[in-house]
Amino acid sequence: MTTKILPSQPKVGMVSLGCPKALVDSERILTKLRADGYGLSPDYAGADVVLVNTCGFLDSAKEESLEAIGEAMAENGRVIVTGCMGKEADVIRARFPNVLAVTGAHQYEQVVEAVHDAAPPTQGPFVDLVPEGGLKLTPRHYSYLKISEGCNHSCAFCIIPDLRGKLVSRRIDAVLREAEKLVAAGTKELLVISQDTSAYGVDIRHDPRQWHGREIRAHMTDLARELGQLRTSEGRAPWVRLHYVYPYPHVDAVIPLMAEGLLTPYLDIPFQHASPSVLKRMKRPANEAKVLERLKSWRAIAPDIAIRSSFVVGFPGETEADFQYLLDWLEEAQLDRVGAFRFEPVAGAQANALPEPVPDEVKEERYQRIMAKTAAISAAKLEAKIGRTLPVIIDEVGEADEDGSIGATGRSQADAPEIDGHVYLRDVAATLKAGDIVDVEIEDADEHDLFGVVT
């Protein structure tokens, strides 16, 4: 009897850059390739072809993408480029004429076809190689859930609509089906992402679909309520975290879901600035006073709600008075987590044509001031948590010290992965593992992180 020797499966390497939405794109591409029989390589040497999923939002991000392409070309030589910078194929090919293919953002089929051309699959589809929740590039216990693509806004500093197009919402039943599979596969935390989560379903007129015998609208509030009713294998509700939430009036409706425990008390809202004149030049909504009133009302309903936001300093025309207005607004708003960015011109953005550019040294000085302001606010808010007992999801468990003690790193409900703070735990049990959710007594705090012990 002879044994048929099957040809080895071609292997694909992946370099994923940019935002969580791009990471989801990478996961979908790899899931399809795995189903087509491809193996995954953790390094350049073992890959038959390397995919580089690029970011093209800022010039600095473009340069990082070009450097990543250059490294992949030097280390492997067989490279396919995809992602947001794929829109600038001429720039990529001018610098790297030997790349095998260049495709744009979320062009999954074109990427897969390019891989097939570069390293043909040796066998037919192997759907059984794909986990129930698809391939993931995040730890098993948390997953990004992308609900739409593109954006209908025309912010002066942004080129996302040019890179990713207008808003295209996924069907509500498709989103819920994916979420259900992720939770069944071990996900304990769902991070809902898009370019504009609040606008979910607008483009499809909130098209209702049947889900487990009920009609559910494609609307952020309806989606949040349904996600909050999912259950893990232990019978617990997963943490559900909303990102990129524009403060439209209907956002008020999700706050009671937080009070009911259906939604993690956390909102990521891209305010960008507070000065009405700067917001007008940015082509952003200028209702900062109303926002302060709403923040107070949200906190009255869900006292533990954490608000994260990001701000741009040094936007063209920003005066010292504008910047001081922002600092005063932040003092009153008392946001929990804040990211700040120095304005950077982006090729194709409307802001490039605005007069009165802010000098780089002024941008830097304002950046340092806003970071100092928000760090002080964060330190005070975290100090107020000392003595409380909070639920914490474990991200990593360390090795035992010489005395046998083990430490761990986790996050509270106020902390999203990668962008917010941590909770550092001492003297944890050897049985503790990533993905466990435990009650932690907070013993100490600094301006970013909490420190505690499992109760």
Swiss-Prot record:
Q: Which residue intervals define the domain MTTase N-terminal in the entry? A: 10-120
The entry's free-text remark on the cofactor is: Binds 2 [4Fe-4S] clusters. One cluster is coordinated with 3 cysteines and an exchangeable S-adenosyl-L-methionine.
Boundaries of every Radical SAM core domain copy: 137-380
| Molecular function in Gene Ontology | 4 iron, 4 sulfur cluster binding; aspartic acid methylthiotransferase activity; metal ion binding; protein methylthiotransferase activity
Q: Which Pfam families match?
A: Radical_SAM (PF04055), TRAM_2 (PF18693), UPF0004 (PF00919)
Q: Which PROSITE patterns match?
A: MTTASE_N, MTTASE_RADICAL, RADICAL_SAM, TRAM
Alphabetically sorted, this entry's keywords are: 4Fe-4S, Cytoplasm, Iron, Iron-sulfur, Metal-binding, S-adenosyl-L-methionine, Transferase
* Gene Ontology biological-process entries: tRNA modification
Q: Which GO terms describe its cellular component?
A: cytosol
Where's the TRAM domain? 383-455
Protein residues bound to [4Fe-4S] cluster 2: C151, C155, C158
List locations, semicolon-separated: Cytoplasm
* Cofactor(s) needed: [4Fe-4S] cluster
Tell me the enzyme class: transferase
Q: What does this protein do?
A: Catalyzes the methylthiolation of an aspartic acid residue of ribosomal protein uS12.
Family from the record = Belongs to the methylthiotransferase family. RimO subfamily.
Return the protein name: Ribosomal protein uS12 methylthiotransferase RimO
**What does the organism's lineage look like at the top?**
Bacteria, Pseudomonadati, Pseudomonadota, Alphaproteobacteria, Sphingomonadales
